[in-house]
A protein has these predicted regions:
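Nucleotide-sugar-dependent
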Residues: 220-221, 225-258, 264-275
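Membrane-proximal helix-turn-helix segments that form the acceptor-binding/catalytic region
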Residues: 89, 101-120
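Conserved catalytic-core segment of nucleotide-activated headgroup transferases in glycan assembly
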Residues: 10, 14-32, 145-153, 157-230
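N-terminal pre-catalytic "stem/leader" segment of glycosyltransferase-like enzymes
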Residues: 1-65
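Conserved acidic donor-binding segment of nucleotide-sugar-dependent glycosyltransferases
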Residues: 277-278, 282-289, 297-303
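Donor nucleotide-sugar binding/catalytic pocket of nucleotide-sugar-dependent glycosyltransferases
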Residues: 116-152
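C-terminal amphipathic helix plus adjacent low-complexity
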Residues: 317-318, 323-425, 429, 436
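A short, well-ordered alpha-helix in the C-terminal region of glycosyltransferases
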Residues: 297, 304-319, 331, 348
C-alpha cells in the first residue's frame, strides 16, 4: 500500500528552546502518530537531495547566509516552505547582549528572502503578523506550545509565606531592571514574602534577605519540570513596549497560567491580547508605582490570587496544549501545494528520522571543507589563528554530537508518552497550596 503521508524536512539553525518547543517536538509527535514522515536536521547538514526528497520544507528562526542555498534548492525543486519565526528579527535592538549577529546585513537579507519565498509564515504575535505581512501574503498567528507532560506536583506549603518568582532566560537582563526598585520596596513592607529571581542577577536585590537567586537552566524541559514543582504563588512578567519586544510570544503567560501561578504582566500587546485583566492575570503599566501597587495588591488578596490562578490554568488547558499545537502544524502542512508524487512504499514506523546517510555526508563535506582550509589559513594568518579556528570547529562537532543526543532524547520521550510509558500528567492545581 502506498505511503501518502507528507514528507517534511525540518531544518533548524540550532537546538534552543524555541526551535525545540515550537518545531521539533510537535513535528516529532506528528511523525510518531504516522501523520507525516519527518526528516529533522540542521542547516549545515542539509543537502539538495534531502530537499528533493521532501514534500514540504520547514525553516525557523534565523537563516545563516552561508546556507542560503537551501532557499535556492527549494525554489528550483518547487518545494513549498513553511517558515516559523517567534521574534522580530528585523528589529534586533543593539542593547541586548549576544544578538548583534542577527542584525548583520547578510543575515537580514537572508531573512527577508525567506519571508518572501515562504508559502506560510507562522508567528505568535499579532503585532509581528502585521509587520511581516509586508513581505508575505500568508502570515498566520498560532497559539504558543506547552508541554503538559513536564508538569510536576508541588509540595504542600505549610509555612504561610507568599512566594513570588521572576524567571527569565536573559542572564544580562535589561527588561527586568524595571522591577528592581518596586520589588525592593514591596519586600521591605512585606516580611512574609519570598522572592525567587531565576536566571538573571540583579545585584540591588541579591543582598535582600527575602530574595533567593537560582541560576539559568539552559535545558528547557529540565527548567520547566523544576519550575512547576516549586509551587510559586505570584509570577512577574515585565516587557518593554518597543518594536522588537512586541514581536514576542506570550510565553510567560503560558508558563505561569499552566502552573496555577497568579501572573502580573506588563500591559503591552504581547499580553493584553490574551490575558484578561483581574481574571486570568493583572495587567500593569510600565512604571515603578504601578508595578509596586499591583504586586502589593496580589500579595494582600489571597482570593484574587486564587481566582486568577484557577481561571488562568483553565484558559491554558484549553488554548495551550499539544492537540492545538499539532493541529495547527498539520493544517499548515496540508495547506501548501505539495509536489505530485508516485506511490511510495510505507516507511518504517520508528523513532528514527529518514535521511541519516545525508546527514553523515553533510558532516563529511563539512569536515572536508575544514581540512582544505588549514594550509591557506596557516600561510596567511599563522599557527595561532589555525589553532583558534580548529578549536571553534571542535566545539561545533561537539554541538553536532549534542544535537544527535538531544534529538534521540526527544524521540524517546515522545515514543514513551505515545506508548503510555510516561505515566499520568501531573495536575498541580491551586488545590495543592494553602491559602495565605
Amino acid at each position: 500500500m502506498a505511503d501518502v503521508r507528507p514528507r517534511v524536512l525540518a531544518i533548524l539553525p540550532a537546538l534552543f528552546p524555541s526551535t525545540i518547543i515550537g518545531v521539533a517536538k510537535p513535528l516529532l509527535r506528528l511523525h510518531h502518530d504516522r501523520r507525516i514522515v519527518l526528516d529533522l536536521t540542521l542547516q549545515y547538514l542539509t543537502s539538495r537531495r534531502a530537499v528533493a526528497r521532501a514534500d514540504v520544507v520547514v525553516l525557523c528562526h534565523t537563516i545563516d547566509p552561508q546556507y542560503g542555498v537551501i532557499l535556492d534548492w527549494a525554489r528550483e525543486l518547487g518545494r513549498p516552505i513553511i517558515y516559523e519565526i517567534d521574534d522580530d528579527l528585523l528589529a534586533v535592538p543593539d542593547d541586548i547582549p549576544g544578538l548583534a549577529y542577527l542584525a548583520e546585513p547578510a543575515r537580514q537579507a537572508q531573512l527577508v528572502a525567506c519571508l518572501r519565498q515562504a508559502d506560510i509564515v507562522r508567528v505568535y504575535s499579532p503585532a509581528l503578523r502585521e509587520k511581516l505581512s509586508a513581505y508575505s501574503a500568508n502570515v498566520s498567528v498560532v497559539s504558543g506550545p506547552l508541554d503538559w507532560s513536564l508538569m510536576r506536583t508541588p509540595a504542600l506549603k505549610r509555612d504561610g509565606l507568599v512566594t513570588i518568582v521572576y524567571a527569565t532566560g536573559r542572564t544580562q537582563d535589561r527588561v527586568g531592571a524595571m522591577l528592581v526598585a518596586p520589588l525592593g520596596r514591596v519586600l521591605d513592607r512585606h516580611p512574609g514574602v519570598r522572592l525567587t529571581v531565576w536566571g538573571a542577577r540583579h545585584d540591588a536585590l541579591m543582598s535582600h534577605p527575602q530574595v533567593r537567586s537560582l541560576p539559568l537552566v539552559r535545558d528547557y524541559d529540565t527548567f520547566f519540570e523544576r519550575f512547576s514543582r516549586e509551587g510559586f504563588d505570584i509570577g512577574l512578567a515585565p516587557l518593554r513596549d518597543d518594536e522588537f519586544h512586541r514581536g514576542k510570544s506570550n510565553n510567560k503567560f503560558r508558563e505561569y497560567a499552566s502552573c496555577g501561578i497568579a501572573g502580573v504582566y506588563s500591559d503591552v500587546c504581547v499580553y493584553n491580547t490574551s490575558v484578561e485583566h483581574e481574571r486570568t492575570g493583572l495587567l500593569v503599566p510600565n512604571d515603578d508605582r504601578s508595578w509596586e501597587s499591583a504586586i502589593s495588591r496580589v500579595i494582600a488578596d489571597p482570593e484574587l490570587r486564587r481566582g486568577i490562578a484557577e481561571r488562568g490554568r483553565a484558559y491554558a488547558r484549553e488554548h495551550f496544549n499539544e492537540a492545538v499545537t499539532d493541529a495547527a502544524w498539520m493544517h499548515a502542512i496540508e495547506s501548501v501545494d505539495r509536489p505530485a508524487r508516485p506511490g511510495r512504499a510505507p516507511s518504517s514506523h520508528s523513532g528514527s528520522s529518514p535521511g541519516e546517510l545525508d546527514k553523515a555526508l553533510g558532516l563529511a563535506r563539512f569536515l572536508g571543507k575544514l581540512a582544505g582550509q588549514v594550509t591557506p589559513v596557516l600561510r596567511e594568518h599563522g599557527v595561532r589563528v589555525v589553532v583558534q579556528r580548529t578549536w571553534q570547529h571542535v566545539q561545533g562537532l561537539g554541538q553536532f554530537a549534542a544535537w544527535l543526543l538531544k534529538r534521540r532524547q526527544l524521540e524517546r520521550r515522545i515514543n514513551a508518552r505515545r506508548s503510555g510509558g510516561s505515566g499520568p500528567v501531573a495536575e498541580p492545581g491551586v488545590s495543592h497550596r494553602t491559602s495565605h
